[in-house]
């Protein structure tokens, strides 16, 4: 009997070797794209790129390249039996990331099309998915019937960082990121699907989708909160409480970072996210992430690696720029540490790396410094990164610091500027911002070319503002809307506001004095009126009357 049990145990071991084999996640690089057998061809890009991605290439004269082709399905199918899980694929790097048992490594290496295998990280552990209950929705309905609001009040907590860059002047000219797509690569977006600051972009379908490249999970809303905070600086919209830098842009929320560990695999997660962003037709990548050292010290980068051509993530960031996207990356928060220098991918060429200043425009002590190892100016630009107010996961607003939070200030406003100048390439847009930064004539290693002036970059002059037309937003509206009043000479008399329905019935009649009108009027009087089209008549002086339609949903 004992002999039979021993035989059974030996058979069990022989047939279940993989159960006891140690598994890890590896990078598997291929030698080529197998173009003879690959069903994807460059002459048929609709099979692997979105229409918007193809349009971007055509608009800026960017040719399709071998790096645009997906991996060879034949190669993947050949090695798939030896993989526990396939995590990500990279057409740019011609590689994939997979969890593999140690006993399968030699079998994978034996394939002639396998160029290299490289350890990246331990296997994925069970993710922590602790959802926060009891989200408190902030009530913003207690508004006066019609009141005047200055810019500083309208923007709420974000007036200071936005006005420092004159971003509010872009917004006044109706450039708020409309028709621009921003991909946010981050560690998670907890409660973005619930928080009131994102209600505006949710109800207007401005969240195009989500992906998790870090753990292959279908949800990004129950993980880390860092991306939530970053996104709020661009997409937040609660008038008089919190207005972000690009509230009309559309967003992809892409999780590439695992908050509890740091391995080189996260750079490859980022690469997969950037490739997805490209294929989906993204205009701007916001990356408030950076890498220097890892939990496995053999994977650590050195300052010599900060040349834009060595680390995987920096090579991918340059590749993303070559596809026509504007990549905006945080410089890093190690300016007061031994490392001191920028982190990857901030060292990449052709992208914008962003440092931090305090509310007075002075260098923030923690902001990572340049130059790159090969002597290029880094960071290129700077924005406020001290005392930034961001959305917390419990619907409160908290104050925080870091280049993670100066970066979306630049990304969002860059989307607004690109909206105004769609004919510019990403490189031309970058150069336009650099030329209009306050240290352009004398860049340094702390702030690079300095703080960009988006009004000047947008060719907005004071005399233009004085001639600007009345602007009504949001239009369509649901409960309330705002009227931007141009700075024309109104004299000493009152400003008259009248609103009519399509039957010609006057449903609102208000007047304001020049001293109280300011730049913006908030109207809440139509909250109880039926949906439909209304006519606004605004008389600024006897010679200046504007009529405009507005739609209530």
Please place each PLM-identified region on the residue numbering:
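Subtilisin-like serine protease catalytic core
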Residues: 23, 40, 158, 168-211, ...
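C-terminal subdomain of the subtilisin-like protease fold in secreted/lumenal serine endopeptidases
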Residues: 159, 280-286, 419-471, 475
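Extracellular S/T/G-rich loop segment that most often corresponds to the catalytic His/Ser-adjacent loop
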Residues: 186, 346-419, 423
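Bacterial Sec-dependent N-terminal signal peptides
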Residues: 1-24, 523
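Autoinhibitory propeptides
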Residues: 74-162, 168-171, 349
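Primarily auto-inhibitory N-terminal propeptides
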Residues: 20-85, 103-129
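C-terminal outer-membrane/trafficking sorting elements
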Residues: 20, 465-473, 477-553
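Substrate-binding/access-modulating region of protease and related hydrolase catalytic domains
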Residues: 171, 237-240, 253-350, 360, ...
């Amino acid at each position: 009997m004992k002999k039979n049990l021993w035989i059974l145990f030996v058979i069990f071991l022989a047939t279940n070797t993989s159960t006891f084999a140690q598994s890890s996640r590896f990078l598997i690089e291929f030698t080529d794209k197998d173009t003879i057998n690959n069903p994807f061809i460059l002459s048929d890009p609709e099979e692997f790129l979105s229409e918007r991605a193809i349009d971007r290439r055509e608009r800026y004269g960017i040719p399709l390249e071998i790096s645009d082709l997906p991996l060879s399905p034949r190669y993947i199918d050949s090695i798939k039996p030896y993989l526990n899980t396939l995590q990500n694929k990279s057409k740019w790097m011609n590689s994939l990331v997979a969890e593999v048992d140690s006993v399968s490594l030699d079998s994978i290496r034996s394939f002639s099309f396998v160029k290299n295998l490289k350890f990246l990280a331990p296997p994925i552990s069970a993710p922590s998915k602790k959802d926060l209950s009891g989200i408190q929705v902030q009530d913003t309905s207690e508004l006066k019937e019609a009141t005047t609001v200055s810019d500083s009040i309208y923007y709420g907590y974000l007036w200071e960082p936005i006005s420092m860059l004159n971003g509010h002047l872009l917004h006044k000219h109706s450039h708020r990121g409309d028709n621009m797509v921003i991909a946010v690569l981050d560690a998670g977006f907890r409660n973005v699907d619930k928080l009131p600051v994102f209600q505006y972009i949710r109800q207007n379908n401005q969240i195009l989708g989500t992906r998790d490249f870090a753990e292959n999970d279908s949800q990004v809303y129950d993980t880390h909160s860092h991306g939530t905070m970053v996104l709020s600086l661009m997409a937040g919209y609660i008038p008089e409480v919190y207005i972000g830098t690009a509230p009309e842009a559309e967003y992809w929320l892409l999780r590439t970072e695992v908050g509890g560990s740091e391995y080189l695999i996260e750079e490859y997660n980022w690469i997969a996210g950037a490739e997805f962003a490209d294929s989906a037709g993204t205009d701007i990548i916001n990356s408030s992430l950076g890498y220097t050292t890892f939990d496995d010290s053999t994977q650590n980068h050195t300052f010599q690696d900060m040349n834009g051509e060595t680390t995987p993530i920096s090579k991918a960031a340059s590749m993303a720029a070559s596809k026509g996207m504007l990549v905006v990356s945080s410089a890093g928060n190690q300016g007061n540490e031994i490392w001191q220098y920028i982190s990857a991918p901030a060292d990449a060429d052709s992208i914008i790396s962003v440092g931090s200043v305090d509310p007075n425009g002075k260098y923030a002590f923690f902001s990572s410094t340049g130059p790159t190892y090969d002597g290029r100016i880094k960071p290129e630009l700077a924005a406020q990164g001290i005392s930034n107010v961001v959305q917390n996961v419990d619907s409160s607003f908290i104050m925080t610091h870091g280049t993670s939070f100066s970066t979306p200030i630049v990304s969002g406003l860059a989307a607004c500027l690109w909206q105004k100048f769609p004919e510019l390439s990403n490189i031309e847009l970058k150069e336009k911002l650099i030329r209009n930064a306050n240290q352009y004539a004398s860049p340094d290693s702390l702030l690079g070319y300095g703080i960009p002036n988006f009004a000047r970059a947008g060719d907005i002059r004071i005399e233009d503002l004085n001639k600007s037309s009345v602007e009504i937003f949001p239009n369509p509206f649901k409960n309330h809307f705002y009227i931007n009043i141009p700075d024309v000479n109104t004299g000493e008399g009152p400003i008259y506001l009248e609103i009519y329905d399509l039957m010609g019935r006057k449903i609102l009649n208000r007047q304001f004095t020049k001293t109280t009108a300011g730049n913006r009027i908030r109207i809440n009087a139509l909250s109880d009126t039926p949906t439909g089209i209304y006519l606004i008549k605004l008389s600024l002086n006897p010679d200046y009357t504007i009529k405009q339609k507005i739609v209530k949903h």
